[in-house]
């Protein structure tokens, strides 16, 4: 649980109910960072709890415990989101919702991260599939990343409804090793996820 919950514990041989602190109160008290991944897929009731922590003073009130937690000076809160809080307008991120403007306004910094450079993505794929770290293998991985770049351009132009992520390129490289066939691995890793008309 994010805030905490009542839990049954043994004390002096007897069962007692005690509040067990959740991850958010614990993190607030300590010099640490907490990261909420896929933040825009969170439930509204959870979002409103986090919204209180995003205020300028960042206090969290535990009403049932009659306690106000002030954040540690080095506490930090981060979140990741594919939709930047705008909701899913493309149909690619089903299950996400638009984050209300009051919530978005409380995030003091928002950074947008686009795809990596060709060379950086190639290096990551090579680190995940080190078998390719030969002259021929590096050329193959570079060509795979070029194909991924082409799918991203086609997606932005509205020509494709599916995009190739770095995760997909890594899977393609690994599957090509398993099947010993780059084309067949491409079909299984990416092409079969595309709309039938787009496959042609």
Which residues are covered by each model-predicted region?
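C-terminal regulatory/interaction module of P-loop NTP-utilizing enzymes
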Residues: 1-200
């Amino acid at each position: 649980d994010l805030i905490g919950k009542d839990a049954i514990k043994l004390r002096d041989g007897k069962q007692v109910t005690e509040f067990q602190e959740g991850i958010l109160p614990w993190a607030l008290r300590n010099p640490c960072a907490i990261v909420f991944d896929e933040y825009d897929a969170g439930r509204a009731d959870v979002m409103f709890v986090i919204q209180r922590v995003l205020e300028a003073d960042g206090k969290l009130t535990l009403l049932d415990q009659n306690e106000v937690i002030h954040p540690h000076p080095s506490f930090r809160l981060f979140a990741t989101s594919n939709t930047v809080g705008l909701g899913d307008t493309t149909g690619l991120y089903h299950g996400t919702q638009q984050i209300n403007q009051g919530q978005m306004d409380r995030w003091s910094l928002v950074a947008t991260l686009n795809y990596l450079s060709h060379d950086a993505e190639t290096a990551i794929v090579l680190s995940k599939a080190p078998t390719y770290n030969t002259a021929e293998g590096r050329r193959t991985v570079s060509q795979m990343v070029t194909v991924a770049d082409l799918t991203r351009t086609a997606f932005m132009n509205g020509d494709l409804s599916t995009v190739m992520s770095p995760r997909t390129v890594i899977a393609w490289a690994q599957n090509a090793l398993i099947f010993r066939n780059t084309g067949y691995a491409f079909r299984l890793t990416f092409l079969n996820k595309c709309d039938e008309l787009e496959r042609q």
